[in-house]
Swiss-Prot record:
K(+) 2 binds at residues 245, 456, 459. Disulfide bonds: none annotated. This is Betaine aldehyde dehydrogenase. Involved in the biosynthesis of the osmoprotectant glycine betaine. Catalyzes the irreversible oxidation of betaine aldehyde to the corresponding acid. It catalyses: betaine aldehyde + NAD(+) + H2O = glycine betaine + NADH + 2 H(+). NAD(+) binds at residues 150-152, 176-179, 229-232, 253, 285, 386. PANTHER family: ALDEHYDE DEHYDROGENASE-RELATED. K(+) 1 binds at residues 26, 93, 180. It is an enzyme of class 1 (oxidoreductase). The gene is betB.
């Protein structure tokens, strides 16, 4: 018997049964308890969701921008009213500590919807005079039906981040959450409907990557916004282009450098490094897992990091005192443990953690101890590949030019950060780092106003910020001739 019972699809403003006859299970990563059986969408269900979205989008786009803005603001109010309920569900589904989900996941999702609700009325075109009797004007029009494909680490936040600009611009969205964490996207659908979003404007289909492929290849979808791994992202981009030249936004993986210079405040640097590696049990795409520390301060910095790691409170995610929970699944646990063994085998010095936690209640969950490796080299697997778990690699460096070259020596380019008291060095270094999201003397905050996305193979396009709204519209150019038409023939 599952905790939440059978979960259906959400299409056309309400719950409907999938036609596939298939279900999949979702589990509590802290206890192994069966949370729900979830119906998997078929190709016919995806077609139904897209058709429903097309119908709803026509009604939604016909509303004034102010009407859409007011409805989205009501959704924000409902999200905030239900913050505690949604946070508790997100904690069960992801294994994140309740203190984290209460303060971050729904809060930041609501903030982004509120931000774009405010921008909905600011979507406007241009008027360009050509000559006395002729001018051009432009219109920004919605794309139509968009697809959103979410990741398992921030389920409801990602759903909010993808729907907010899409809906603000007058589009509809068919959303597929990760099959690992499928529950809270359905609650967001309920909230949008209660707020007054027309039926079909936000539909949720469930399933694995095959359902994502159906969305990506669907001829009636105009844009795909995907969050996930690099290899899957390449497949999404290929299928989106091959099917109908869809627009794509992709936020992919990272192996981000955090550079600690010799003039850094060591306590601040250690605090930043621990947050940048162990928040959300290390399951954050922007984590600063390659920690480059100037050789002259490496020992003192490492000591401070280890002191802070000892203070991490690993425990049950539902306990208010816990600030470090399990990994999201058994598969993710096995992957992370494999990387840890690789680090040991390649000669990295294990300074903390490095094991699965199995004592007491930990034994039924997917827990791994916060892990720190020292004496790391650039060619090690734990340094070059994205782990997506609580594994910090400490490397030393001598010069600014050297560390910048090493930091950039990766096919990733999602995030980067520096810790230094020298303002000139901070900006000089950041300007040379090949990363789309950068922090100086801090790490990790992604406010609604800040565009989020990567360089290189870490992504295409951006989430959040004003620029993202533009990419959920298309420009129509119109020339108006007030004078006499001069025929060619």
């Amino acid at each position: 018997m599952s905790v939440f019972g059978l979960q259906r699809l959400y299409i056309g403003g309400g719950y409907v049964d999938a036609t596939s006859g298939k279900t999949f299970d979702t589990f509590d990563p802290a206890t192994g308890e069966l949370l729900a059986q979830v119906q998997q969408a078929s190709a016919a269900d995806v077609d139904r969701a897209v058709a429903s979205a097309q119908e709803g989008q026509r009604e939604w786009a016909a509303m004034t921008a102010m009407q859409r803005s007011r409805i989205l603001r009501r959704a924000v109010d409902l999200l905030r009213e239900r913050n505690d309920e949604l946070a508790a569900l997100e904690t069960r589904d992801t294994g994140k500590p309740i203190g984290e989900t209460l303060a971050v996941d729904i809060v930041t999702g609501a903030d982004v919807i509120e931000y774009y609700a405010g921008l909905a009325t600011a979507i406007e075109g241009l008027q360009v005079p050509l000559r006395a009797e002729s001018f051009v004007y432009t219109r920004r029009e919605p794309l139509g039906v968009c697809a959103g494909i979410g990741a398992w680490n921030y389920p409801i936040q990602i759903a909010c981040w993808k729907t907010a600009p899409a809906l603000a611009a007058g589009n509809a969205m068919v959303f597929k959450p990760s099959e690992v964490t499928p529950l809270t996207a359905l609650k967001l659908a309920e909230i949008y409907t209660e707020a007054g979003v027309p039926a079909g404007v936000f539909n949720v289909v469930q399933g694995d990557g095959s359902v994502g492929a159906l969305l990506t290849g669907h001829p009636d979808i105009a844009k795909v916004s995907f969050t996930g791994g690099v290899e899957t992202g390449k497949k999404v981009m290929s299928l989106a282009g091959a099917s109908s030249l869809k627009e794509v936004t992709m936020e992919l993986g990272g192996k981000s450098p955090l550079i600690v210079f010799d003039d850094a405040d060591l306590d601040r640097a250690a605090d930043i490094a621990v947050t940048a590696n162990f928040f959300s049990s290390g399951q954050v795409c922007t984590n600063g897992t390659r920690v480059f520390v100037h050789r002259s301060i490496k020992d003192a910095f490492t000591q401070r990091v280890l002191e802070r790691v000892k203070r991490i409170r690993v425990g049950k995610p539902t306990d208010a005192d816990t600030n470090f929970g399990p990994l999201v699944s058994a598969a993710q646990l096995d992957k992370v443990l494999g990387f840890i063994e690789s680090g040991k085998a390649e000669g990295a010095k294990l300074l903390a953690g490095g094991t699965r936690l199995t004592d007491g209640h930990f034994g039924s969950g997917q827990y791994v101890a916060p892990t720190v490796f020292g004496d790391c080299r650039d060619d090690m697997k734990i340094v070059r590949e994205e782990i997506f778990g609580p594994v910090m690699s400490i490397l030393d460096f001598e010069s600014e030019d050297e560390v910048i070259a090493r930091a950039n020596d990766t096919h990733y380019g999602l995030a980067a950060g520096v810790v230094t008291e020298n303002l000139s060095r901070a900006h000089r270094t950041i300007h040379r780092l090949e990363a789309g999201i950068c922090w100086i003397n801090t790490w990790g905050e992604s406010p609604a106003e800040m565009p989020v996305g990567g360089y290189k193979q870490s992504g295409v396009g951006r989430e959040n910020g004003i620029t993202t709204l533009e990419h959920y519209t298309r420009i129509k150019s119109v020339q108006v001739e007030l004078g006499r038409y001069n025929p060619v023939f």
